[in-house]
Amino acid sequence: MLRSILMSMPASLKFLGTGGARFVVARQLRASGGTIIRAGDVTLVMDPGPGTLVRCARSRPPVDAASLDGVVLTHAHIDHSCDVNVLVDALTDGGLRHRGLLFAPRECLEGENAVVLRYLRPFLEDVVVLKPETTYRVRDLEFRTSL
């Protein structure tokens, strides 16, 4: 769902884990911590599955969750969204700093399978509902959703 369109700037992807599917995730046969996307001065985490916060702290060099610019969820499955709430709490210093962005499909925000806690949402600068085939921009980083 996320395609990074990188301009002429330093950019990187850091995989905090590549584990997926319930049995791999439940047993942590491979880490399932999502992906750090950096472009210019922007740092986002995409699909923060189980252990993302811990994997950020243990990565080399460490990724300070409080310095993230936002979180991108592609869908509501637990292996892609489990740590979204703790990351929102971290990047807003428990709501003391009104900052950061959350990009998520409607299913992650509404209904019986919503994965983002309502009390955390006002802590963020903005909560953006992702739509198909739409381009989004965070300063130096631009990305486009697929179908």
Task: Place the predicted regions along the sequence by residue.
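Active-site metal-binding motif and surrounding structural segment of the metallo-beta-lactamase
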Residues: G51-F103
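Active-site metal-binding loops of divalent metal-dependent hydrolases
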Residues: T18-G20, G49-G51, A76, E107, ...
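A generic structural signal for short beta-strands and their flanking turns/coil linkers
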Residues: A31-G33, V42, S67-D69, H98, ...
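Short, Lys/Arg-enriched N-terminal segments with co-localized hydrophobic residues
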Residues: M1-M7
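Conserved beta-strand hairpin/beta-sheet module of binuclear metal-dependent hydrolase folds
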Residues: S8-R60
